[in-house]
Regions:
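Bacterial N-terminal signal peptides that target proteins for export
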Residues: 1-9
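Polar/charged, compositionally biased leader and regulatory segments
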Residues: 2, 20-119, 230-265
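Intrinsically disordered, low-complexity regions enriched for glutamine and histidine
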Residues: 4, 21, 204-206
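Bacterial N-terminal signal peptides
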Residues: 9-17
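Catalytic cores of peptidoglycan-degrading enzymes
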Residues: 103-237, 243
Length: 265
C-alpha cells in the first residue's frame, strides 16, 4: 500500500515538472506611446520678480571735454595771436585733451574740401601751421565750438581769426579775403567764419591753419588727419615747461581716464 502511494506521488511530481518546463511565460503588454497625466487646476502664485533684476542703466550722453577757459577778452587779447589763458595750467603743469570724447557733430575740418599744400614745420623756415587750398573765396568753418577772440588784419597773417575753444585749444585761420565774425561771437563747429583769400604774406588763395594751446603753436596733424580730414581719436598730453608747452599725442586706456594722468619722467 505504501509503495503504491509512493509511486503515485512520484508520477504526480513528474507530471507537474514536465508541465512547468513546457509552459511559456505570458507576454507583457507594450508600454503606451504617450502617458496621460491627470489634470489639476492648481493656481500658481502671482509674483513680480523684477525686484530681483538690476535697474536698466541709462545710456551715457557723450559730450566734448570742456575746460574752464577765459571768455572775457582784453584789448590786448583781441589784437595778438599768441596769448596765454590764465585759467590753463593754473593747478599743475599738465592739461589733457581727450579727442576721442568729441562727438562727430562737434568738430569740423576747417576747409571741408581742401588739400594740404604746405605742412607744419619745414627745413628753410619754421612753418607754424599748415596751408590748405581749394579755391578763392571758399568757406572756412570753425573746427570746434568756441568764442572768437581776435578778428582783424595782422601783419603777415593778413585777415586773421582766432577762436578760443572750450576744450582748451585755440585755432587760427588766416589770409582770409573776408572775415565773417567779430571778437566775442560764439561759434559752433562747422559754422562759416571766413572766406579763403591771399591777404598778408601769401602767393595764392589758401587757408593758413594753426592749432595752439596757451599761445604756443603745435602740429595740427596731431589733432586732424589731414589726408582724411578727420579728427584723430587720440589724447593730447600738454605739458608746460617754462614759457613753452610740449604737446604729445598718446593712446589712453579706459582705466587711465578715471584718475589723473602722471606723465612719464
Amino acid at each position: 500500500m505504501a509503495s503504491k502511494i509512493h509511486n503515485g506521488i512520484l508520477i504526480l511530481t513528474l507530471i507537474l515538472f514536465a508541465s512547468c518546463r513546457t509552459q511559456k511565460p505570458a507576454p507583457r503588454p507594450a508600454p503606451p506611446e504617450t502617458v496621460d497625466f491627470p489634470t489639476a487646476n492648481i493656481p500658481l502664485p502671482v509674483m513680480d520678480f523684477n525686484f530681483m533684476l538690476p535697474e536698466t542703466p541709462e545710456l551715457a550722453v557723450c559730450h566734448s571735454p570742456r575746460k574752464d577757459i577765459t571768455e572775457a577778452f582784453t584789448p590786448r587779447d583781441k589784437s595778438q595771436i599768441a596769448i596765454k589763458d590764465p585759467k590753463l595750467f593754473d593747478e599743475n603743469n599738465t592739461e589733457i585733451i581727450d579727442l576721442s570724447l568729441i562727438p562727430s557733430g562737434e568738430y569740423a575740418f576747417p576747409l571741408p574740401k581742401g588739400n594740404v599744400i604746405s605742412p607744419y614745420g619745414g627745413r628753410r623756415r619754421h612753418h607754424s601751421g599748415v596751408d590748405i587750398k581749394t579755391c578763392a573765396n571758399d568757406t572756412i568753418v570753425s573746427a570746434f565750438d568756441g568764442i572768437v577772440r581776435m578778428a582783424k588784419p595782422f601783419a603777415a597773417y593778413g585777415n586773421v581769426i582766432v577762436v578760443r575753444h572750450y576744450n582748451g585749444l585755440e585755432t587760427i585761420y588766416s589770409h582770409n579775403s573776408k572775415n565773417l565774425v567779430k571778437p566775442g561771437d560764439r561759434v559752433l563747429a562747422g559754422q562759416p567764419i571766413a572766406l579763403t583769400g591771399r591777404t598778408g604774406r601769401a602767393t595764392t588763395e589758401h587757408l593758413h591753419f594753426e592749432t595752439r594751446i596757451n599761445g604756443v603753436h603745435f602740429n595740427p596733424n596731431i589733432v586732424f588727419n589731414m589726408a582724411k580730414r578727420k579728427l584723430r581719436s587720440k589724447c593730447l598730453v600738454c605739458t608746460q615747461k617754462g614759457n613753452n608747452v610740449i604737446v604729445k599725442s598718446v593712446d589712453i586706456l579706459p582705466h587711465q581716464k578715471a584718475g589723473p594722468y602722471v606723465p612719464p619722467p
